[in-house]
Regions:
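Flexible, surface-exposed loop/linker segments and immediately adjacent secondary-structure boundaries
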Residues: 9-261, 265, 269
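Charge-dense, extended regions
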Residues: 283-285
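Extended, charge-rich intrinsically disordered regulatory tails
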Residues: 276-281
Length: 285
């Protein structure tokens, strides 16, 4: 299992700093992750409420997650001109890229907004109800994300500006972060993020397998918006065979109706022309 885990995540990023516990969901399995663990596409991280974890990428980009943050490496591009994507479901995060390759960009998805950045440094606080982003330096593009995953008009923000999106309201752009944002921000976010990757070039750690994911482990992700939870049905379908996982899926089906076809496949079977129930095939209750 350890060999499979490391092969899964060869090039995307490395955990270079860990304070407190870090849970890693890879595939449908939960691991404990430590400094030196390599990360790959699809990896989901949950950070200790009192801790932090820093990910450094091969192109020099750095992402620090703090105070219970939950994030997923959705797609990490390998080429210099590619666009990498990271979902931050909740909590605090600071990202920076001092010298991005020509055309290289990172897109950060939150439940309420999307930010695309090249050479920029920013701090964000994300939750289901709101997203706040302080652009420390550089420039970014941002847009609102609706409950159904629809992207709004793309707007620009530059160093010093503060983006706030609450609920379904239109995002506001202010000249400085709010006092409350600064007060609640993790203290180490006031400083530049340290560059630690070179120290770990010859160090490789393997995540420790804990257990197959429970519904509680992934509940918040399964209930996220369409732009964040795509591919989750295929990824976690194997866990629907577990009786408790299945029970919770059914109990919360309204929050993730895309699971209906997995849970009740008979509703979607094609009926023969002589089947008295053929007129009801494919209906969804």
């Amino acid at each position: 299992l350890g060999a499979c885990a490391s092969a899964f995540a060869q090039t995307a990023g490395t955990l270079t700093l860990v304070e407190g516990s870090v849970e890693l969901i890879r595939g449908a399995t939960l691991y404990a992750a430590t400094q030196g663990v390599r990360l790959g596409d699809g990896d989901i991280l949950s950070i200790d409420p009192k801790g932090q974890a820093q990910i450094e990428f091969q192109d020099g980009a750095i992402l620090n997650l703090s105070q219970g943050a939950r994030a997923m490496l959705t797609n990490i591009a390998s080429g210099a001109r590619g666009q990498s994507e990271i979902a931050v479901l909740s909590g605090w995060a600071k990202f920076t890229q001092k010298k991005s390759g020509k055309g290289a960009q990172y897109r950060y998805l939150t439940p309420r907004a999307e930010i695309t950045a090249g050479e920029a440094t920013a701090v964000l606080s994300a939750g289901d109800g709101s997203t706040e982003i302080y652009i420390e330096s550089g420039a970014v593009k941002f847009s609102e994300i609706g409950r159904k995953g629809v992207q709004g008009i793309v707007r620009d923000a530059k160093g010093g500006e503060f983006i706030v999106r609450r609920g379904e309201q239109q995002a506001t752009l202010g000249p400085r972060p709010s006092a409350e944002f600064v007060k609640n921000m993790p203290r180490h976010f006031r400083d530049d993020l340290p560059v630690l990757l070179d120290r770990l070039k010859n160090r490789r750690s393997e995540p420790k397998r804990e257990h197959e994911v429970t519904y509680a482990d992934v509940e918040a992700w399964l209930k996220a918006g369409p732009s964040i939870k795509r591919n989750f049905v295929k990824r976690f379908e194997i866990r629907s065979k577990d009786s408790e996982f299945r029970r919770k899926l059914i109990e919360n089906l309204r929050e993730h109706p895309e699971w209906d076809k997995v849970l009740f496949p008979e509703k979607y079977e094609r009926k023969g022309p002589n089947d008295p129930k053929s007129g009801q095939s494919g209906t969804q209750q």
